[in-house]
């Protein structure tokens, strides 16, 4: 190749090269999030076909703090179809708590052994290592506002919990939730990153900070 051809080879400016490197770094982080980022709410995008709607940062924090207060140091927490609460819990507590995410969406398998594949249609189809009544609290957010979905999810909740239940679902499910799980509606109103058409509420079966703030 001649010197003339070398001179005519397109060269990126320092600014353009830096921008390109930043773009590639962002792409890599989305594919392979770092340890400090992998628990960020939204690191995995909502899939509306799976009826996924993430909580706002404030709501996820409130629910995570409620769970921590309810179980105490060293407690075991199950998040059933509530991935954004799991993420906030792990963001707050890297150690001293056992926290599991029960989820249909296998993208959350990035969380390793704490991910348990879960299909509410088969409510008790769980790994042998998940023993009955082995969690101090179960936080559940059934993906669909239907009696069938709540009933089947309730089977899972009752199998997992040692007693405490924190249910998040529509206000229209209040009567069914009380019948199935013995829970009562809290004054705290959860919010999502996107506004939902249906009013959403929290329900518990124990004395909760969600009625007075933590």
UniProtKB/Swiss-Prot annotation:
Indicate whether Repressor appears among the record's keywords: no
According to its UniProt record, the EC number is 2.1.1.-
What InterPro entries does the entry give?
Answer: DNA_methylase_N6_adenine_CS, Efm5/EEF1AKMT1, Mlase_EEF1AKMT1/ZCCHC4, SAM-dependent_MTases_sf
Q: Name which cysteines form disulfide bonds.
A: none
On the tree of life, the source organism's domain of life is Eukaryota
Q: Which residues carry this modification: N-acetylserine?
A: 2
Catalyses:
L-lysyl-[protein] + 3 S-adenosyl-L-methionine = N(6),N(6),N(6)-trimethyl-L-lysyl-[protein] + 3 S-adenosyl-L-homocysteine + 3 H(+)
What are the record keywords, sorted? Acetylation, Cytoplasm, Methyltransferase, Phosphoprotein, Transferase
Tell me, what's a Pfam family for it? N6-adenineMlase
In Gene Ontology terms, what is a biological process of this protein? Answer: peptidyl-lysine methylation
Gene Ontology cellular component? Answer: cytosol
What GO MF annotations does this protein's record show?
methyltransferase activity; nucleic acid binding; protein-lysine N-methyltransferase activity
Mainly resides where? cytoplasm
Question: In the record, which positions carry Phosphoserine?
Answer: 2
Signal peptide span per the entry? none
Subcellular location per UniProt equals:
Cytoplasm
State the SUPFAM superfamilies in the record.
S-adenosyl-L-methionine-dependent methyltransferases (SSF53335)
Q: Which family does it belong to?
A: Belongs to the class I-like SAM-binding methyltransferase superfamily. EFM5 family.
Task performed by this protein: Protein N-lysine methyltransferase that selectively catalyzes the trimethylation of EEF1A at 'Lys-79'.
- The protein depicted here goes by the name EEF1A lysine methyltransferase 1
Question: Gene name, please?
Answer: EEF1AKMT1
């Amino acid at each position: 190749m001649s010197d003339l051809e070398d001179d005519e080879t397109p060269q990126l400016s320092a600014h353009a090269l830096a921008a390109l490197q930043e773009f590639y770094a962002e792409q890599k982080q989305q594919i392979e999030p770092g340890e400090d980022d992998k628990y960020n709410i939204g690191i995995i995008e909502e899939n509306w076909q799976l009826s996924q709607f993430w909580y706002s940062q404030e709501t996820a924090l409130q629910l995570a703090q409620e769970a921590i207060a309810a179980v105490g140091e060293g407690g075991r927490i199950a998040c059933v179809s509530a991935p954004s609460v799991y993420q906030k819990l792990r963001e707050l507590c890297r150690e001293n708590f056992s926290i599991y995410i029960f989820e249909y969406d296998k993208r959350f398998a990035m969380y390793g052994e704490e991910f348990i594949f879960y299909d509410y249609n088969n409510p008790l189809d769980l790994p042998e290592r998940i023993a009955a009544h082995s969690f101090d609290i179960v936080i559940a957010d059934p993906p669909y506002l239907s009696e069938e979905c709540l009933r089947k999810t309730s089977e899972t909740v009752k199998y997992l919990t040692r007693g405490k239940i924190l249910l998040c679902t529509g206000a229209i499910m209040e009567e069914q939730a009380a019948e199935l799980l013995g829970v009562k509606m809290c004054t705290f109103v959860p919010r999502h990153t996107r506004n939902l058409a249906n009013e959403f509420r929290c329900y518990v079966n124990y004395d909760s900070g969600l009625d007075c703030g933590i």
